Design a protein with these regions (language model features):
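Internal maturation/activation junctions in enzymes
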Residues: 2-35, 39, 44
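Alpha-helical interface subdomain recognition
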Residues: 13-14, 29-30, 40-42, 112, ...
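Buried hydrophobic positions in well-ordered alpha/beta secondary-structure cores of metabolic enzymes
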Residues: 19, 37, 48-50, 82, ...
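Short Gly/Pro-enriched turn/cap motifs at secondary-structure boundaries
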Residues: 25-28, 54-57, 73, 100-107
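Short acidic, glycine/serine/threonine-rich loops at helix termini
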Residues: 28-34, 57-61, 75-77, 93-96, ...
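Short beta-strand elements
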Residues: 32-39, 66-67, 111, 115
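A short core secondary-structure module
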Residues: 45-92
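A glycine-rich, basic-preceded beta-loop-alpha segment at the flavin cofactor/substrate interface
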Residues: 90, 95, 110-139, 156-174
Length: 182
């Protein structure tokens, strides 16, 4: 509840968010995540150190980060989920911004975390098993809907153009090659 009270009002006001999962040596194998989370008993915070890659909205204000909280583990049971308030200081370095074909309004970044303070979301060891899997399933639905919407809009644009564009005295939709494509 404390995390909700702190971050949800900011999200409602327009602060951006990111889900920082992928790493250079892990790729889609999230059980191989190595970004290290170390707990500091003095201030009650966790500190994150390591690299994330291909992070959509990598420069976001609020970051949800999957990190290895359990020393000596090498599977999903050693991962926890953290929320980071990105102060846009030198502790999170945007090392690279990908040059993408589309969706340029959302930077895809490589990030270096340098002892970044974070708060644990939920329970330790459930980062991948419970929290990330739940978020990813929702994200997959959103990506599917976005893809259907974009392809439908592209088709409708092409169809309207083919009906309006005239060549050799007729709409190009009447040419068999164009008609077959649409």
């Amino acid at each position: 509840e404390e995390i909700k009270d702190e971050f949800l009002p900011r999200i409602a006001k327009g602060d951006t968010c990111s889900m920082d999962l992928t790493e250079p040596d892990a790729g889609s194998d999230l059980q191989a995540v190595q970004l290290k989370a170390t707990y500091n008993e003095k201030d009650g915070l966790w500190y994150l150190t390591g690299v994330k890659r291909f992070i959509t909205n990598g420069d976001a204000h609020i970051k949800l980060v999957l990190a290895r909280s359990e020393e000596g583990t090498n599977d999903g049971r050693g991962l926890s989920y953290f929320v980071v308030d990105n102060k846009h200081d030198s502790r999170i370095l945007v090392r690279r911004i990908e040059n993408k074909l589309g969706i340029k309004g959302s930077p895809t970044c490589e990030l270096v975390f340098n002892n970044v303070p974070a708060k644990l979301v939920g329970s330790r060891r459930l980062g991948l098993i419970k929290y990330v899997m739940s978020l990813m399933n929702g994200a997959r639905l959103g990506i599917g809907a976005q893809s259907v919407g974009l392809s439908s809009a592209a088709y409708n644009e092409a169809l309207a153009y083919a009906r309006d564009r005239r060549q050799f005295g007729k709409a190009i939709i009447e040419f068999p090659a164009v008609f077959e494509m649409l």
